[in-house]
């Protein structure tokens, strides 16, 4: 399977000095293709933009990553009775999918996501099929390759594993379906990209409200169970390029009945 030549990124709300994304000197020295969600980059990849990098859309990486250190918190089981921060869905949930996650080789819990298929059916079908693996490829075994506390966790690059790859069920990329749904708070599930109409398989889960990403990234679902696990992932200690020091891997994934 062909992989993307550039990195998908998500821009955060921190200062440019802290993240090193919008810093001109860094961008000049790392003059590469930035695919939405900019946070600095490697040779190329998809990254999300921060608020300080407000002028740039969340793109696939190709900038300069900032080295940020986060305190690793104890793993907490994501039981329904312990859930927190579950916001009201913006649309009808048409499908439920899940990620079973391990951190550092140890089982950490499950994240359940509701998808909004009536609003963005094409985007939802892409994500759903990559969760089930029915196309013979998908998210199983892939990692959350980029984590930024108080912003988001990013994953979905199952071809390269570093933010430079991933493909959709429709081919390498597909168009932005619409921007009807917004990045309203923690748990929002949205597509990482490398600019307009470059959606593949990379996605991110917000841990705060990220309104600066509205109209740049396609929102298609939200976490309905497992926000405590999302917080645990968000708090992982990272090294250069916001890569978690301990592997954060999706060891199983699939679709659930709506009434489950």
Swiss-Prot record:
Keywords: Chaperone, Chloroplast, Disulfide bond, Isomerase, Plastid, Rotamase, Transit peptide. Disruption phenotype: Hypersensitivity to high light and rose bengal. GO terms for cellular component: chloroplast stroma. Its EC number is 5.2.1.8. InterPro entries: Cyclophilin-like_dom_sf, Cyclophilin-type_PPIase_CS, Cyclophilin-type_PPIase_dom. Transmembrane segments: none annotated. Residues 1-79 form a transit peptide. Induction: Strongly induced by light. It catalyses: [protein]-peptidylproline (omega=180) = [protein]-peptidylproline (omega=0). One of its GO terms (molecular function) is peptidyl-prolyl cis-trans isomerase activity. Changing residue 253 to S: Reduced PPIase activity, lower sensitivity to redox regulation. The keyword Plastid applies. It comes from the Eukaryota. It is found in: Plastid, Chloroplast stroma. Signal peptide: none annotated. It is an enzyme of class 5 (isomerase). Belongs to the cyclophilin-type PPIase family. PPIases accelerate the folding of proteins. It catalyzes the cis-trans isomerization of proline imidic peptide bonds in oligopeptides. Required for the light-induced increase of thiol accumulation. Assists the folding or assembly of SAT1 enzyme to form the cysteine synthase complex. Links light and redox signals to the regulation of cysteine biosynthesis in response to stress. This is Peptidyl-prolyl cis-trans isomerase CYP20-3, chloroplastic. It comes from Arabidopsis thaliana. The gene is CYP20-3.
């Amino acid at each position: 399977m062909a992989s993307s030549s550039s990195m998908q990124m998500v821009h955060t709300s921190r200062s440019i000095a802290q993240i090193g994304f919008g810093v001109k000197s860094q961008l000049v020295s790392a003059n590469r293709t930035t695919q939405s969600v900019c946070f600095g980059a490697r040779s190329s990849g998809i990254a999300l933009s921060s608020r300080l990098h407000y002028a740039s859309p969340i793109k696939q990486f190709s900038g300069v990553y900032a080295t940020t250190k986060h305190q690793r918190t104890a793993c907490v089981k994501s039981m329904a009775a312990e859930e927190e921060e579950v916001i009201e869905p913006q649309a009808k949930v048409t499908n439920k999918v899940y990620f079973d996650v391990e951190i550092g080789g140890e089982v950490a819990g499950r994240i359940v996501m509701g998808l909004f298929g009536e609003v963005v059916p094409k985007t939802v079908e892409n994500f759903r099929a990559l969760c089930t693996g029915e196309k013979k490829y998908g998210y199983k075994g892939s990692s959350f390759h980029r984590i930024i506390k108080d912003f988001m966790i990013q994953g979905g690059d199952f071809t390269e594993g570093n933010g430079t790859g991933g493909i959709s069920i429709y081919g390498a990329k597909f168009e932005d379906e619409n921007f009807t749904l917004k990045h309203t708070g923690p748990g929002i599930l949205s597509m990482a990209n490398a600019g307009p109409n470059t959606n593949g398989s990379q996605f991110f889960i917000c841990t705060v409200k990220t309104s600066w990403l509205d109209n740049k990234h396609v929102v298609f679902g939200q976490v309905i169970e497992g926000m405590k696990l999302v917080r645990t992932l968000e708090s992982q200690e990272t090294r250069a390029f916001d890569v978690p020091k301990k592997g954060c891997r999706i060891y199983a994934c699939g679709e659930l009945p709506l009434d489950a």
